[in-house]
Amino acid sequence: SPAFAKQDGTLHIEKDNPKIITLEKAVANALLKNPTLSAHSLEKRVREARTLQSGLLPNPRLEVNVDDALGSGPFNGFDRSETTVQVGQLIELGGKRGARENANRIAERVADKTYESKRLDILTDVNKAFVEVLSSQNKVKLTEELIELGDKFFNAVGERVKAGKVAPIEQTKAGVTLSTFKIEMAHAKLELKQARRKLSSTWGNAEPQFVSVTGNFFKIYPVPLLESLQNKGVETPYLERWKSEQERRQAMVDLE
């Protein structure tokens, strides 16, 4: 929360308004609460556990057999019974364990790149939805100003009609224009409502808990160098996921 000093020297901390969200807050909500992203995060942990398990030796088998425990006479009970204990350990030959571990490690990398790809998709969706809300808010605001101007113009024309300076048809035209602005306002408010729902759905809320968003349409960021863009294009998680998926399929063939 932002803080500033009062004139008396005390520090005042301004609390964030939960009803007004920024792009940063919207992104944080989506990364923390998006159900699809959470599912991919769980898949990552499952793959990590499988990779760890595949690197371990299979659990040994323990068998205990008791013979002649149900005899008769002097052989009744466990006094004359024979107990056999067998311990078995599976030993995999032909590099099977190493191949299985490699396949699981590659599958873990696929899950990791899938998560990164989905994370980028969510970030893109949040940014687009946020811009739609901000744009819809501005449209509502501009339409409100048009209605205010149209109302003033309608009243002004009415006064001129009363004074006999213009024909009554002019006030009728002004009324039609004002009605058109009001219809546009209804459409703008509906678009804003839909945009707010779309944004809140990126973090799993069917109905938005916020009232408005705040941001700057006209903030200009420096253009990155072409070399850095080329490197990022090669290192995208989408391409890396595709490569890892090819390796995973080959590893599964080797495992068979």
Task: Put a short name on every predicted segment.
Residues 1-3:
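C-terminal segment of classical bacterial N-terminal signal peptides
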Residues 6-20, 52, 63-100, 209-224:
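Small/polar, glycine/serine/threonine/aspartate-rich low-complexity segments that form flexible
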Residues 6-7, 21, 118-240, 245:
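Periplasmic alpha-helical coiled-coil/stalk elements that build and connect Gram-negative outer-membrane
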Residues 28-38, 45-59, 74-77, 85-103, ...:
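A glycine-/polar-enriched beta->alpha junction
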Residues 44-46, 67-70, 247:
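Short beta->alpha connector loops
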Residues 77-81, 105, 175:
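Short, conserved loop/turn and helix-capping segments at secondary-structure boundaries
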